[in-house]
Protein backbone atom coordinates (compact mmCIF):
# COMPACT_ATOMS: atom_id res chain seq x y z
CA UNK A 1 0.00 0.00 0.00
CA UNK A 2 1.41 3.34 -1.04
CA UNK A 3 0.24 6.62 0.44
CA UNK A 4 1.52 10.12 1.04
CA UNK A 5 0.78 12.92 3.46
CA UNK A 6 0.64 16.27 1.67
CA UNK A 7 0.05 19.80 2.84
CA UNK A 8 -2.51 21.82 0.94
CA UNK A 9 -4.47 24.92 1.99
CA UNK A 10 -2.68 24.87 5.33
CA UNK A 11 -4.00 21.39 6.17
CA UNK A 12 -2.38 17.97 6.10
CA UNK A 13 -4.10 15.29 4.04
CA UNK A 14 -3.46 11.53 3.75
CA UNK A 15 -3.77 10.67 0.03
CA UNK A 16 -3.75 7.41 -1.94
CA UNK A 17 -3.67 7.01 -5.75
CA UNK A 18 -7.04 6.43 -7.38
CA UNK A 19 -9.08 8.24 -4.73
CA UNK A 20 -10.61 11.71 -4.79
CA UNK A 21 -10.55 14.28 -2.01
CA UNK A 22 -12.28 17.58 -1.29
CA UNK A 23 -9.85 20.34 -0.31
CA UNK A 24 -10.35 24.06 0.20
CA UNK A 25 -10.83 25.96 -3.05
CA UNK A 26 -7.61 26.12 -5.05
CA UNK A 27 -7.66 29.47 -6.88
CA UNK A 28 -6.28 29.59 -10.39
CA UNK A 29 -7.16 26.00 -11.27
CA UNK A 30 -9.65 24.92 -13.89
CA UNK A 31 -11.70 21.75 -14.10
CA UNK A 32 -9.95 18.74 -15.66
CA UNK A 33 -6.54 20.43 -15.39
CA UNK A 34 -3.46 18.66 -13.96
CA UNK A 35 -2.17 19.65 -10.55
CA UNK A 36 1.18 18.92 -8.88
CA UNK A 37 1.30 18.90 -5.07
CA UNK A 38 4.95 19.36 -4.12
CA UNK A 39 4.58 19.91 -0.37
CA UNK A 40 4.86 16.23 0.54
CA UNK A 41 5.52 15.55 4.23
CA UNK A 42 5.73 11.74 4.17
CA UNK A 43 5.66 8.86 1.68
CA UNK A 44 5.04 5.23 2.62
CA UNK A 45 5.76 2.80 -0.21
CA UNK A 46 5.24 -0.87 0.76
CA UNK A 47 6.43 -0.31 4.32
CA UNK A 48 9.39 1.90 3.45
CA UNK A 49 8.79 5.32 5.01
CA UNK A 50 10.40 8.50 3.64
CA UNK A 51 10.00 11.39 6.06
CA UNK A 52 10.70 15.01 5.13
CA UNK A 53 12.20 17.81 7.21
CA UNK A 54 9.66 19.42 6.72
CA UNK A 55 9.14 18.32 3.09
CA UNK A 56 10.46 15.33 1.15
CA UNK A 57 12.83 16.66 -1.56
CA UNK A 58 11.93 15.80 -5.17
CA UNK A 59 8.60 14.26 -4.16
CA UNK A 60 5.48 15.13 -6.14
CA UNK A 61 1.88 13.96 -5.91
CA UNK A 62 0.18 14.28 -9.31
CA UNK A 63 -3.54 15.05 -9.22
CA UNK A 64 -6.31 16.19 -11.54
CA UNK A 65 -8.98 18.78 -10.68
CA UNK A 66 -12.37 17.10 -11.11
CA UNK A 67 -14.69 19.94 -10.17
CA UNK A 68 -15.20 23.05 -8.08
CA UNK A 69 -18.09 22.69 -5.69
CA UNK A 70 -19.52 23.92 -2.43
CA UNK A 71 -19.72 21.99 0.81
CA UNK A 72 -22.77 21.23 2.90
CA UNK A 73 -24.56 24.18 4.45
CA UNK A 74 -23.70 24.95 8.06
CA UNK A 75 -26.30 26.89 10.03
CA UNK A 76 -25.04 29.38 12.63
CA UNK A 77 -27.73 30.50 15.07
CA UNK A 78 -27.06 33.14 17.71
CA UNK A 79 -29.61 33.99 20.36
CA UNK A 80 -29.50 36.13 23.45
CA UNK A 81 -32.10 34.90 25.91
CA UNK A 82 -34.66 37.39 27.23
CA UNK A 83 -33.50 40.09 24.79
CA UNK A 84 -35.33 39.10 21.62
CA UNK A 85 -32.09 39.06 19.64
CA UNK A 86 -31.82 36.26 17.12
CA UNK A 87 -29.49 35.83 14.15
CA UNK A 88 -29.56 32.94 11.73
CA UNK A 89 -26.84 32.69 9.10
CA UNK A 90 -25.66 29.97 6.78
CA UNK A 91 -22.26 29.15 5.28
CA UNK A 92 -21.15 26.89 2.44
CA UNK A 93 -17.41 26.36 2.09
CA UNK A 94 -16.03 26.55 -1.47
CA UNK A 95 -14.20 23.29 -2.24
CA UNK A 96 -12.15 21.73 -5.02
CA UNK A 97 -12.46 17.99 -5.70
CA UNK A 98 -9.15 16.45 -6.83
CA UNK A 99 -8.34 12.92 -8.04
CA UNK A 100 -4.92 11.61 -7.03
CA UNK A 101 -3.29 10.05 -10.09
CA UNK A 102 0.23 9.13 -8.94
CA UNK A 103 2.90 9.51 -6.28
CA UNK A 104 6.43 10.21 -7.52
CA UNK A 105 9.77 10.27 -5.71
CA UNK A 106 13.09 11.27 -7.35
CA UNK A 107 11.52 11.12 -10.81
CA UNK A 108 10.25 7.54 -10.46
CA UNK A 109 6.55 6.75 -10.15
CA UNK A 110 5.88 4.75 -6.98
CA UNK A 111 2.15 4.22 -7.47
CA UNK A 112 -0.52 5.14 -10.02
CA UNK A 113 -4.29 5.08 -10.04
CA UNK A 114 -5.79 1.76 -11.07
CA UNK A 115 -7.91 2.27 -14.17
CA UNK A 116 -10.21 -0.68 -13.46
CA UNK A 117 -10.20 -3.64 -11.09
CA UNK A 118 -9.02 -6.88 -12.69
CA UNK A 119 -11.93 -8.85 -14.09
CA UNK A 120 -12.24 -12.57 -13.61
CA UNK A 121 -12.66 -14.62 -16.76
CA UNK A 122 -14.52 -17.34 -14.86
CA UNK A 123 -17.51 -15.16 -14.03
CA UNK A 124 -20.10 -17.70 -15.13
CA UNK A 125 -22.20 -17.71 -11.98
CA UNK A 126 -25.96 -17.59 -12.41
CA UNK A 127 -27.38 -14.41 -10.90
CA UNK A 128 -31.03 -15.53 -10.94
CA UNK A 129 -30.67 -17.69 -7.86
CA UNK A 130 -32.60 -20.56 -9.48
CA UNK A 131 -30.68 -23.82 -9.61
CA UNK A 132 -30.12 -25.21 -13.08
CA UNK A 133 -32.21 -28.25 -14.05
CA UNK A 134 -30.22 -31.43 -14.39
CA UNK A 135 -30.91 -33.54 -17.46
UniProtKB/Swiss-Prot annotation:
Give start-end positions of Polar residues composition bias.
109-128
Q: GO MF terms on file?
A: rRNA binding; structural constituent of ribosome
Spans annotated as Disordered: 109-135
Listed under GO cellular component are:
cytoplasm; ribonucleoprotein complex; ribosome
A Pfam short name: Ribosomal_L21p
Keywords, ordered alphabetically: Ribonucleoprotein, Ribosomal protein, RNA-binding, rRNA-binding
Per the UniProt entry, what is one GO biological process?
A: translation
Q: Self-association or partners: how does it assemble?
A: Part of the 50S ribosomal subunit. Contacts protein L20.
- What NCBIfam families is this protein classified in? L21 (TIGR00061)
Its job: This protein binds to 23S rRNA in the presence of protein L20.
How is this protein named in the record? Large ribosomal subunit protein bL21
Q: Which organism is it from?
A: Synechococcus sp. (strain JA-3-3Ab)
**Corresponding gene?**
rplU
